[in-house]
């Protein structure tokens, strides 16, 4: 039963990933009306999934934590502290306090 539950949550995460991908694409074309609407949709979804204790891991601007983050790159950035997350490639998620997918991040050197 628990394995099926995690499969369902991972499918929800895949949907959120697709929304993020569309958001990034629309943002590249400066389509603020579309990105604003996507932000509203994602905010609603986050509220709903929060009620079932599926939480997006806060990453951008935070410091790298190997328990919840997966470092996929390191870049020089003099405006950030060492090991501070400067970019999130893929959001991570926790279910009831347990990581079901770490956030893939790029950190400052």
Specify the residue positions occupied by each region the protein language model found.
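Charge-rich, N-proximal long alpha-helical rod segments
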Residues: 1-10
């Amino acid at each position: 039963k628990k394995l099926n539950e995690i499969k369902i949550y991972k499918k929800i995460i895949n949907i959120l990933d697709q929304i993020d991908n569309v958001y990034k694409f629309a943002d590249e074309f400066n389509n603020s009306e579309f990105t604003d609407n996507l932000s509203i949709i994602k905010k609603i979804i986050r509220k709903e999934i929060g009620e079932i204790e599926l939480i997006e891991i806060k990453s951008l601007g935070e410091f790298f934590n190997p328990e919840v983050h997966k470092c996929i790159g390191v870049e020089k950035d003099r405006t950030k502290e060492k090991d501070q997350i400067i970019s999130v490639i893929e959001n991570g998620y926790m279910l009831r306090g347990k990581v079901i997918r770490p956030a893939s991040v790029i950190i400052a050197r």
